[in-house]
Amino acid sequence: MPSFDIVSKMNEVDLRNAVDNAVREVSTRFDFRGVEATIELKDLTVTLRSESDFQVRQLEDLFRNHCSKRNLSTSGVDIEDEPVHSGKFYTLTMTFKQGIDQPTAKEIVKYIKETKAKVQTSIQGDKVRVTGKKRDDLQETIALLKKSNIELPLQYENFRD
């Protein structure tokens, strides 16, 4: 039976490159001259630090632009609502999710079942396996999921006949 897996993975190399390019741009921008502004990456967590709330928001926008240039989706990112102020700096933390958590996996399965597609779904850890009798049914399911409003960036792998 044909099958494929739905996963949510973050390309760590592209994330590192987006951080490096954003840091490089911060060092050359006029509005960040004489200001201590940093962007750091550690274990899929990006920390933005600057001297004012407004500059942290500018760093966030700058970083999101560099992510979009590298085709990294920032839709599945856990981000603090307000920058945290401690001492001289404001800090904003963005955590990129890796894998599909249980509630989101159940939401994906429910969405596929509501569409009445001729496929079966099963949750396997941090991925969702979809099997069907025909390859066309699986491709139709992928098209439906791309149109859905699930907040995680989804990838489709292990497509087997």
Curated annotation (Swiss-Prot):
Keywords of this entry: Nucleotide-binding
CDD domains (UniProt xref): YajQ_like (cd11740)
Molecular functions (GO terms): nucleotide binding
Protein name per its UniProtKB record: Nucleotide-binding protein LPC_0632
NCBIfam families registered for this protein in UniProt: PRK05412.1
Pfam families: DUF520 (PF04461)
Signal peptide span: none
Similarity comment text for this entry: Belongs to the YajQ family.
Cellular component GO terms, alphabetical: cytosol
Protein function: Nucleotide-binding protein.
